A protein has these predicted regions:
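Segments forming oxygen-rich coordination pockets for charged ligands
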Residues: 1-60, 66-70, 85, 171-192
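Structural motif
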Residues: 31, 91-93, 118
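Residue-level detector of alpha-helix initiation sites
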Residues: 38-39, 101, 126
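Short amphipathic alpha-helical segments
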Residues: 45-47, 69-70, 105-108, 132-134
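ADP-ribose/adenylate-binding Rossmann-like module
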Residues: 58, 97, 108-134
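Active-site regions of enzymes building and remodeling cell-envelope glycoconjugates
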Residues: 69-78
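Short amphipathic alpha-helix with an adjacent loop that forms part of the alpha/beta core around
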Residues: 80-89
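Adenosine-phosphate binding glycine-rich loop
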Residues: 122-192
Length: 192
């Protein structure tokens, strides 16, 4: 037999993708921090709970965190953006708080982390434009492309928390476990 070996230099984006795929394939739970324990944050946490994610809900309001079902970790923090700094590498950050200014602080902190695997925020086109201006003012305009806004995409126009949660769960599964058919690293065989 004959073995062919090919070596290529990988850029940081490809390497991050390989690391995410390796983590998903190994069965390790992917850390997901949901910022906001309101209706949408709760629905997202419930949708992600049975999936291969380790969900932690972070909020400034301990009374809302107390209403979460067992099995979902929670953290009451007066400055939720501090949870971003303490999160493990390759974590996903979902920002769905009740306060736009707080959303901006949390998302900016998450985007400042080069090892953040996913950063998403709930919002409209107007919120997206405001956040892009905010990033430009902070000197982080290059990070805007990494932000998923609105989380879950905009293919379904339904604002019910459970629908948003289903779309977010699907988006995270594709992001972390999907395959890119154009990427030769994912083509192991050609099937008839």
């Amino acid at each position: 037999g004959r073995v062919e070996l090919s070596l290529k230099l990988l850029d940081a984006a490809v390497l991050d993708g390989v690391r995410r795929a390796e983590g998903a394939a190994s069965g390790r739970a992917i850390p997901v921090l949901v910022f906001g324990a309101g209706h949408t944050g709760r629905a997202i946490a419930l949708a992600l709970q049975p999936l291969p994610f380790h969900v932690t809900v972070v909020d400034t309001r301990p009374q809302l965190l107390a209403e979460l079902p067992p099995g979902i970790d929670s953290r009451a923090m007066p400055l939720p953006e501090q949870a971003v700094a303490a999160a493990p590498a390759q974590a996903a950050f979902l920002v769905v708080t009740h306060d736009h200014a707080l959303d901006f602080h949390i998302a900016t902190a998450a985007l400042a982390r080069a090892d953040a695997a996913y950063v998403g925020m709930i919002g409209s086109a107007t919120k997206r434009a405001r956040f892009h201006r905010h990033l430009a003012e902070a000197g982080l305009e290059g990070q805007a492309a990494r932000l998923h806004l609105p989380i879950g995409g905009n293919q379904v126009r339904d604002k019910r928390p459970e629908v948003i949660a289903a779309m977010v769960a699907a988006e995270l599964l594709v992001h972390f476990m999907g395959t890119d058919v154009e990427n030769p690293m994912h083509r192991l065989c050609t099937c008839p």
